[in-house]
Amino acid sequence: MLACVIGGYHMPKFVIERELPGAGKLTAEDLQGISEKSNKVIADLGPDIRWLTSYVTENKIYCVYVAPDEDILFEHARCGGFPADVVTRVSAVIDPSTGE
């Protein structure tokens, strides 16, 4: 299993699939507001959750987080008012160099 070290502890990485119709049409200001809200909720939840990156597509946002478990990610979504339709633990990461 893929894990990152936070505070001396190995934490798993997760991908969150968020259904958000029209996500690809959100303005930079909209995305900044969503990001600010997410950062505030993360600060309130404590150091065991870390947002790494997000990918915005036409109707979904895929977010990559490091956290101890799925529960804190669903709590983050609830507190922030964000959808969290699918939360999946990452088993491995590959890239072109994997095939070399």
Name every feature range the model reports, one short phrase each.
Residues 66-93:
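An amphipathic, aromatic/His-enriched active-site/gating alpha helix that lines ligand/cofactor pockets
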Residues 47-53, 86:
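A short linear hydrophobic-aromatic micro-motif
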Residues 1-43, 50, 95-100:
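Short S/T/G/P-rich N-terminal loop/turn motif that feeds into the first structured element of a domain
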Residues 52-62:
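Amphipathic, hydrophobic secondary-structure cores in small proteins
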Residues 18-20, 64-68:
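Short beta-strand-to-loop capping motifs
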Residues 58, 93-94:
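Short secondary-structure capping/turn micro-motifs that flank functional sites
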Residues 16, 63, 73:
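Hydrophobic pocket/interface hotspot
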